A protein has these predicted regions:
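Short, charged beta->alpha transition segments
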Residues: 75-77, 105-113
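Short, well-ordered beta-to-alpha junction loops that form the rim of enzyme active sites
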Residues: 44, 122-126, 159
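A cross-family acyltransferase "interaction/gating" segment
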Residues: 129-212
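Alpha-helical membrane-targeting segments
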Residues: 1-22, 73-85, 165-194
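Catalytic-site beta-strand/loop segments enriched in glycine and acidic/polar residues
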Residues: 110-142
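Catalytic core of membrane glycerolipid acyltransferases/transacylases, capturing the structured
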Residues: 34-100
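Helix-to-loop junction immediately C-terminal to a conserved catalytic motif
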Residues: 13-45
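Residue-level preference for the first positions of well-ordered beta-strands
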Residues: 38-40, 116-120, 153
């Protein structure tokens, strides 16, 4: 298992201690992250809290995340993100140079994999609005499947138990702001902990078998994998 700086460990363990007051997290088959070599980690995105939960629970693993550029605008966030060697992701839809920036992101991801790192990004790029994982026209997962090094393993992560929570889009038109939402729901620390499951699976062979597919079909197959167990029953407490 790879080692990482003490500062990263302290940040992760701080949030893990905090989150475990509210969430009872079960990790299934997390051992697949112990495989040698570079890895791509592709989780589902059920709520705005799940990236923080993933990092808190995987404190033993040196994950390098791709993070929305908006979070780098905040000084506190930026200092934390630097600890994790985070890569800023611009809003490609609003950028005049979207295509070129997408290529740069792909190249950065490839360089990290070639250096043996474990890169994590969310193929859908957004929180689900209906409990299902939907990639739409997203490009990055499809592109990385074409160009990732031969030794890279792809790890799928299905997260269950967060749909319907205050940090999900259940019953909302948009994505809730993470910290204001957490602060206004502090009273939930005094109710039974919410059960969350993170199921890890090595899907490398499956992803490689889709390598020659067009983006639309590739994304559809990945959606079917993510949604194979159906939609979580929404729980609001």
């Amino acid at each position: 298992m790879a080692k990482f700086p003490d500062k990263r460990a302290r940040v992760c363990l701080f949030f893990r201690t905090l989150f475990r007051m509210r969430y009872k997290v079960t990790l299934v088959n997390v051992e697949c992250l112990n495989q040698p070599g570079s890895k791509l980690v592709w989780p589902t995105h059920m709520a705005v809290i799940d990236p923080m939960l993933v990092f808190a629970e995987l404190y033993k693993y040196p994950l390098q995340p791709f993070v929305d550029e908006r979070f780098f605008a905040n000084g506190v966030f930026r200092s934390i993100l630097k600890v994790f060697d985070s890569i800023s992701v611009p809003n490609l839809r609003k950028s005049r140079n979207g295509l070129e920036q997408a290529k740069q992101l792909n190249n950065l991801c490839l360089a990290s994999l070639q250096a043996g790192k474990t890169v994590i990004f969310y193929p859908s790029g957004h929180c689900t609005s209906d409990g299902k994982e939907s990639l739409g026209g997203r490009n990055m997962a499809h592109t990385m499947a074409q160009i990732m090094p031969d030794e890279t393993r792809v790890i799928g992560v299905k997260i269950r138990g967060l749909w319907g929570s205050c940090t999900s889009r259940y019953g909302r038109k948009g994505t809730p702001p993470i910290f204001p939402t957490m602060f206004t729901n502090l009273w939930k620390l005094f109710v039974p902990r919410r059960k969350v499951t993170m199921e890890f699976e090595d899907i490398t062979d499956m992803v490689r078998s889709w390598k020659g597919l067009e983006k639309t079909e590739f994304n559809h197959n990945l959606e079917e994998y993510y949604n194979s167990k159906g939609i979580d029953e929404p729980k609001t407490r």
